[in-house]
């Protein structure tokens, strides 16, 4: 005799917003992997010389690649925002025996993200 297994709908997670957000965050790892691969391809093309880099730029101008990168960017932002949102729950920081407010932890993470983004933009654009 086997245990009773209650049937579960295929898209059970789409009914509640919190479950949907969780599933979208989990799916975002695919797009994070795409960006890592894309950046490695950029580095390889730059290292191989001007012709290789031009071929990569032509590949990147393909409308399918542009749409994929826009979708990937939106998922990457979702991934980053939800990652930072979990930080105050994962990091219990105490100063003088009192817990640091969640907003302060979030502000620190977003400030660090902004500083790193400005530095990277400065390095790339200058």
Swiss-Prot record:
Name recorded for this polypeptide: Fumarate reductase subunit C
Gene behind this protein: frdC
Membrane topology: Multi-pass membrane protein
Location in or out of the cell: Cell membrane
Function noted in UniProt: Anchors the catalytic components of the fumarate reductase complex to the cell membrane, binds quinones.
Molecular function as annotated in GO: succinate dehydrogenase activity
Record-annotated membrane-spanning stretches: 30-50, 64-84, 105-125
Keywords recorded for this protein, A-Z: Cell membrane, Membrane, Transmembrane, Transmembrane helix
Xref: Gene3D superfamilies: Fumarate reductase/succinate dehydrogenase, transmembrane subunit
